């Protein structure tokens, strides 16, 4: 019992979740600007750096949460849920950075409509993740819990939209692009962008579990 008394009882987990979600949105929006300004090399490099900075900041929050889990005697929600949520969120930030790095590495000729649409859906998913995460500290209010669940449903719908865009993009790519190298590049980018929305759906699933168990 003495050991438990020496440890903090809760820790500021919800605030750190919010900080991480903000960094995810920053990374997603910076990536969207990278796509929108792809033909401007200087702007493209600047937004690539912005993505990197946001991802590194998110990574620091993840490490702090994982450290705090082991230092906190009583956590506000289950430790496994905390660990799963923050690490799944961090996967989203990593995928956004991977997408930006892949874009730079492959030097795609130009942005396609499908990249723009998938990017837009990714940004919307990340924004909904931030919205849902912001509600986790207020689950004692039934209306807040219901709002969190509805936001998770929105993320699911956005992920389904991304699936449809992805299938259409692949069909068009194999049908119309004569350059095999460009096919390989675009296929990899489409898959990464769609995976961002998949991972946001994974975050939504974790949040749904937290809401149902703690409201």
Task: Locate each region found by the language model.
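Cytosolic, long alpha-helical scaffolding segments
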Residues: 1-215
């Amino acid at each position: 019992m003495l050991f438990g008394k020496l440890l903090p009882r809760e820790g500021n987990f919800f605030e750190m979740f919010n900080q991480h979600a903000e960094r995810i949105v920053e990374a997603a929006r910076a990536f969207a600007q990278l796509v929108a300004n792809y033909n401007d090399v200087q702007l493209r490099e600047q937004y690539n750096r912005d993505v990197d900075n946001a991802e590194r900041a998110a990574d620091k929050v993840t490490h702090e949460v994982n450290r705090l889990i082991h230092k906190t005697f009583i956590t506000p929600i289950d430790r496994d849920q905390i660990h799963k949520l923050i690490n799944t969120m961090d996967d989203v930030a990593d995928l956004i950075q991977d997408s930006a790095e892949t874009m730079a590495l492959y030097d795609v000729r130009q942005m396609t409509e499908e990249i723009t649409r998938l990017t837009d859906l990714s940004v919307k998913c990340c924004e909904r993740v931030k919205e849902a995460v912001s509600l986790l500290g207020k689950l004692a209010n039934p209306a807040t819990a219901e709002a969190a669940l509805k936001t998770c449903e929105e993320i699911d719908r956005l992920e389904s939209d991304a699936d449809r865009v992805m299938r259409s993009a692949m069909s068009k790519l194999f049908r119309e692009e004569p350059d095999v190298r460009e096919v390989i590049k675009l296929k990899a980018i489409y898959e990464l962008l769609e995976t961002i929305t998949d991972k946001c759906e994974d975050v939504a699933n974790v949040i749904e579990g937290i809401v149902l168990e703690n409201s």
